[in-house]
Design a protein with these regions (language model features):
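Structural signature of alpha-solenoid helical repeat scaffolds
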Residues: 49, 72-73, 105, 140, ...
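Acidic catalytic motifs of isoprenoid enzymes
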Residues: 166, 170, 174-177
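Extended alpha-helical scaffolding segments used for macromolecular assembly and cargo binding
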Residues: 74-159, 164-168
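Short intrinsically disordered, low-complexity coil segments enriched in acidic
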Residues: 1-6, 185-186, 191
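Flexible helix-coil transition and linker loops at the boundaries of alpha-helical arrays
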Residues: 135-144, 175-189
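Short alpha-helical scaffolding segments that buttress acidic/His motifs in well-ordered protein cores
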Residues: 8-12, 152, 190
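C-terminal boundary/linker of central alpha/beta nucleotide-binding cores
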Residues: 1-70, 79-82
Length: 191
């Protein structure tokens, strides 16, 4: 049916699916039952657990659906990714939250999430993951967001590059002064 096809196409922004996640991101109800039905009907939806709570699309099917969504409803795709980012952030899954924020172009949100997650990434030796995200966002985005600049500074500290760390701290300080946010959470960190 058309409503199932729309559900599949819009759900394709997510690499893992659950009823709660789909209900939140797609602003609907009854997703858990629909996911179970689609999985049983062999709609290229693969269960990830014995309780049929989590699913994933076959990768090629997901790529096709996501490509279709991007062509037909680019604004909706961005909004779905924004909501998915919010859902995952609310559950402390920084990787998925950050990936969705980057995908929808929410630079400020990505910076906020990266900054919140940086202690965990640094202490677990996941500096390269953070660097990859900063590279995906690009130099211009990092240079225009205080949280991203501070995240770049932290990654440079862990790599032992004090010169670049100081550069990014200076960029963040300038941005916060321009915004008049020197007394906020990030500003307190710099003082």
């Amino acid at each position: 049916s058309q409503s199932r096809l729309e559900f599949l196409r819009r759900a394709s922004v997510m690499d893992r699916l659950s009823g709660d996640l789909c209900d939140f991101v797609l602003e609907t109800t009854g997703s858990a039952a629909l996911l179970r039905d689609l999985s049983r009907a062999n709609m290229l939806l693969i269960p990830l657990d014995r309780s049929d709570e989590w699913f994933r699309f076959h990768p090629l099917f997901r790529d096709m659906l996501e490509s279709e969504l991007r062509k037909q409803e680019p604004a909706i795709e961005r909004e779905l990714n924004r909501r998915a980012s919010d859902w995952w952030a609310g559950r402390g899954d920084w990787d998925r939250a950050i990936n969705h924020a980057i995908t929808c172009g929410a630079v400020g949100r990505a910076g906020e999430l990266l900054w919140l997650g940086i202690p965990e990434y640094v202490t677990r030796g996941r500096n390269q993951t953070v660097i990859s995200w900063l590279d995906m966002l690009g130099q211009e985005a990092v240079s225009s967001d205080a949280a991203l600049s501070l995240t770049a500074a932290a990654t440079n500290v862990t790599r032992g590059d004090g010169v670049m760390a100081e550069h990014w701290v200076a960029v963040a300080r300038r941005l916060l002064e321009e915004e008049g946010a020197g007394s906020g959470e990030l500003g307190v960190f710099l003082n």
